[in-house]
Design a protein with these regions (language model features):
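Short, glycine/charged-enriched secondary-structure capping and boundary segments
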Residues: 42-45, 71-73, 100-101
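Short Fe-S-cluster ligation motifs
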Residues: 64-82
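N-terminal leader/targeting and pre-domain segments
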Residues: 1-26, 105, 109-111
């Protein structure tokens, strides 16, 4: 894996679905190294991951092996664009697609 998203745990779409279905808090970053907006958000999200106790998972939306599954996941949860920050817990899910989030905004969203 490249330096992009190195602070996150890579995960497959099928494993992400299993985590979403569990009651545990699950934090997922969907993005791609070639996306300029993802490149804007990723350093702040990485800092939050390093400074907090949260394990943030990552799906590279350019992964052609899982493209259909990624599109289905995005459609199901209304993830219109990347970068996307997705949080699920106890059957509830929320998503934000905003590359301008501050570290404080990110922490508020995932907490």
């Amino acid at each position: 894996m490249s330096i992009f998203a190195s602070a996150f745990t890579p995960i497959s779409v099928s494993s992400a679905k299993e985590n979403i279905a569990s009651a545990e808090k699950f934090i997922l970053f969907i993005g791609r190294p070639s996306c300029p907006y993802c490149q804007l958000l990723e350093p702040r999200l990485s800092n939050v991951a390093r400074k907090s106790e949260f394990n943030i998972f990552y799906i590279n939306s350019e992964n052609t092996d899982e493209l259909g599954e990624i599109q289905a996941l995005r459609k199901r949860y209304g993830i219109a664009t990347v970068p996307a920050l997705f949080v699920s817990e106890k059957g509830a899910a929320k998503v934000v697609c905003d590359s301008s989030l501050s570290e404080e905004d990110i922490l508020d969203f995932i907490s």
